[in-house]
Curated annotation (Swiss-Prot):
Family the UniProt entry places it in: Belongs to the HAPLN family.
Name assigned to this protein: Hyaluronan and proteoglycan link protein 2
Link domain boundaries: 148-242, 245-338
UniProt superkingdom: Eukaryota
Gene behind this protein: HAPLN2
A GO CC term assigned to this protein in UniProt: perineuronal net
Organism: Homo sapiens
Record flagged with keyword Disulfide bond: yes
Signal peptide (from-to): 1-26
Disulfide bonds: C57-C128, C170-C240, C194-C215, C265-C336, C290-C311
Cell location: Secreted, Extracellular space, Extracellular matrix
Amino acid sequence: MPGWLTLPTLCRFLLWAFTIFHKAQGDPASHPGPHYLLPPIHEVIHSHRGATATLPCVLGTTPPSYKVRWSKVEPGELRETLILITNGLHARGYGPLGGRARMRRGHRLDASLVIAGVRLEDEGRYRCELINGIEDESVALTLSLEGVVFPYQPSRGRYQFNYYEAKQACEEQDGRLATYSQLYQAWTEGLDWCNAGWLLEGSVRYPVLTARAPCGGRGRPGIRSYGPRDRMRDRYDAFCFTSALAGQVFFVPGRLTLSEAHAACRRRGAVVAKVGHLYAAWKFSGLDQCDGGWLADGSVRFPITTPRPRCGGLPDPGVRSFGFPRPQQAAYGTYCYAEN
């Protein structure tokens, strides 16, 4: 009858349509990957210190019996840290992060992980793994924190830290050792520093925007690398990373010694700010103060967001340093930090 497809014509049409769809989708057998877990729409989740972050993990369907295992892939180490295991009904947390982590459970196929009170050490790569006893599968996501990288050296001068001392020094200044990706991001934002420093992965590098002879030669700008280093014996500076503050930094004027600076902050219900506090206040709160002030490590610094004459002498915003004056020198104010 006119207007009706014949059987051979219908078969040819269906074969053509299947072929086009098959080519567009790819052959599942030739592209191994998740069968139960859906690939994440965004593989990088952005957050900041103190926030609540959600790492999405969603099942397309559920096998008859399964568990979901969340873990954190530790940078520079061939191991994963277990965070949480759930069977869809009950969940159990493990380790220091497990106490701040829970399942979102927005619906029956939701295996997303919620992390409360995000900390600096939470940044990194995470794995959501479905275990069904036959063919396990996983998806990976990265938690990225908004922050700022700052170079750090002690009062004794440059190249004093082995890897473990550099790690401790950053933590004492309200930070942690920066990762390579954090240093790279800082370089794209203008960080130019000619002293090599440890990174979290155990590498030693330094960022150069203006190539020059005393700073790795006159080659192209970039991140210079010293290659593999001995974590115990080799000594360099540190590149630290910090993020948004839970409190505020403020300046107390005066001509104070370091001990008088501590007393001045205590009278105001605060403590002398750490280096990481000052960098975070400069980066996230726009702190701009053309006065040197004591910090907790004994250094004297001041933050500039709007460069101007007779205020550091440099054309770019940043945190300027007067080094480490004698603690008894009564010549500076102080920067205090108070929790909200």
